[in-house]
Amino acid sequence: MHQGKLVFAQVMAHLPLSTFRRCVARHGGERKVKSFSCLDQFYAMAFAQLTFRESLRDIEACLATQGKRLHHLGFRSPVARNTLANANATRPWQIYAELAQHLIAIARPLYANEPIGVELNETVYAFDATTIDLCLSVYPWAPFRSTKAAIKLHTLLDLRGSIPTFIHISDGKTHEVRILDALTPEPGAFYLFDRG
């Protein structure tokens, strides 16, 4: 019988917990929380992402199959679908946005010398957006067309290592040009845009 740490626990061991706790405290994420902490929520959503879960029911069922190993994955108790849904609906999203920016700042220097296929010493960025279709009856706050809802994900990608350095989510009608004002240009860097 294998006695080592589970792979998920090994991956989560790299999470800077002190930074995560600072983000949670800064945005009041643990206010009125009794048992399902922000860290539990993060573990559940990270598990869902890494195991390609597609719904809350899918996450709950997959975690339930782990039984006694759930503790070894980092969870303090079983994750209920309703509890996870409430946490996703009420917890400040800024916690996870700030954590993502911190993790990106750690990852970028690791790929600073990665070749990009073109002999340039300068940083090369690619800026693009993708439209994510949503159901209009479920997301009425994101109208896109008369029968459809959507949001747009604008991303600035550092081509060395393919690491996003800027991510902005807007309504589906926002053109990429309107987001350019939110970018802080880096002197000497090259920026690639499509005509979108």
Enumerate the predicted regions with their spans.
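Conserved, well-structured functional cores that handle cations and Mg-NTP chemistry
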Residues: 1-196
